Amino acid sequence: MAEITAAMVKELRERTGLGMMECKKALTAAGGDIEKAIDDMRAAGAIKAAKKAGNIAAEGSIAVKIAADNKAAVIIEVNSQTDFLALQDDFKGFVAESLEKAFNEKLTDAAPLVEAREEARLALVAKTGENVNIRRLTRVEGDVVGAYLHGHRIGVVVNLKGGNPELAKDIAMHVAASNPQFLNASEVSEEAIAKEKEIFLALNADKIAGKPENIVENMVKGRISKFLAEASLVEQPFVKNPEVKVGDLAKQAGAEIVSFVRYEVGEGIEKAEVDFAAEVAAQVAATKQ
């Protein structure tokens, strides 16, 4: 068998856009023949998939799997370029298999899952013509773990000390609807408070102008108190019964909220702005590849 040199791997990588390990694997299978390796990779759809990798994937699905004893759960986000693909069976199957693997192997980070599912991902990209990425994963373990999935776009996992699965699911539903930023006020950083103060002062510059310093200080304190209540889960009015705060709801059931994880599809991903004509042209061009 021909020796696979670094120069050969480099050349194949430059010509195909694929990773070094994939190029080395392809060269080994092709007996060191670069042209054959390229043909094999093209036949497998790998090169097409690599070209799609630069496309922004900001749609997709959130998926959650919870243990039968409610002691553990895994939540993952898998992105696609369009919501249309997120609703198709091929994509759903990829997500389900990825979630199952993450849960069964007790993975706590997305990196090993991304590596393990790369071949299946490339096959899906080649078949659908869209970029697909496993973006993130969180595993939660605790006394009582509950989850709520709102369609395929928002997923929440809540960890309780005490209580029951129904309570955990109710609180998870609340988190999905109200999107708290923190568990309680003690988790709010000084940076977040300073930013909120800065925003308040900027938005109310006209109202504040000419007022005594102590009055302005009280106005700021009032806004910060409101911010902490709005942003903290335990201080929010429970969506099913606004007369009760979420923290009090948990206490009444003999429970304490330990943590929560909320995923929403595409949050934090900067979407490229493409006009309609350009999008249609791009789709037409894609059909000719």
UniProtKB/Swiss-Prot annotation:
Q: Does the keyword Cytoplasm apply?
A: yes
Tell me the keywords, alphabetical order. Cytoplasm, Elongation factor, Protein biosynthesis
Tell me the superkingdom of the source: Bacteria
Where found in the cell?
Cytoplasm
Which InterPro entries does this UniProt record tie to the protein? EF-Ts_dimer_sf, Transl_elong_EFTs/EF1B, Transl_elong_EFTs/EF1B_dimer, Transl_elong_Ts_CS, UBA-like_sf
Region spans: Involved in Mg(2+) ion dislocation from EF-Tu: 82-85
GO MF term set: translation elongation factor activity
What's a GO cellular component annotated to this UniProt protein?
cytoplasm
Q: What is its main location?
A: cytoplasm
The protein's job, in short, is: Associates with the EF-Tu.GDP complex and induces the exchange of GDP to GTP. It remains bound to the aminoacyl-tRNA.EF-Tu.GTP complex up to the GTP hydrolysis stage on the ribosome.
Similarity comment: Belongs to the EF-Ts family.
Name of the protein in its database record: Elongation factor Ts
Q: Which organism is it from?
A: Pseudomonas aeruginosa (strain LESB58)
